[in-house]
Amino acid sequence: MKIAQIAQYAENEYFGKPSGLMDQMASSVGGFVAIDFKNTQAPIIENIPVDFSSYGHALCIIDTKADHADLTDEYAAIPREMKAIAGYFSAECLREISRADVILNMGILRQKYGDRAVLRALHFFEENERVDKLAHSLRHQHFDDFLSSINESGNSSYKYLQNIFAVSDYTHQAVGIALNVAEHALARKGACRVHGGGFAGTIPVSYTHLRAHETRHDL
């Protein structure tokens, strides 16, 4: 926990990046981690063991060759827009309200904050439900359900969270290219999604050993 907090402080104060604790926490704890950030000073952390090879799968990381330079505003816009939606309901964050609140006030929220902010808020609620499903799938060894939820999560990130490419540089979409190639290579036998905060960097890919050669060749 302390390592993650130190890493976050370094990113926030030294590098000027408005990052949260999720990536740092996952790195410091290791493996698959379910985290509840209700209390950011003392998040609830659960390490969930999973052996991909026992399910006939391998996990790899694909470097999209896109760096994170000049993306601070893109990252900062996500929490800013989500908090704006929450603020309409006099809440500090979206976990204090519900999806129904947003749906019932859709018109005024779209008018005041724009469609992207509303879509990102809807992603937040649905993604939190998916996290519970993902954790349940791993705890009970329902690996196919886990893969399905990962793909759903990636699809939602692309359409609703919109963190695959920077709108300020839409001609460069390396993450989108990598996802398209990965999905084709997997042939519906695995999962892929954007990694971390998105916009650049890497994508994780889970592929079956039965298509290992073809997948690696295509990628």
Give residue ranges: language-model regions.
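Detector for methionine-enriched segments
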Residues: 1, 22-25, 82, 106
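Glycine-rich, mobile lid/loop segments that gate access to catalytic sites or pores
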Residues: 2-24
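C-terminal nucleotide
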Residues: 12-15, 33-193, 205-211, 216
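Conserved phosphate/anionic-ligand binding catalytic regions in large, soluble enzymes, centered on
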Residues: 19, 24, 193-202
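Short, well-ordered loop/turn elements at secondary-structure boundaries
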Residues: 29, 55-56, 199
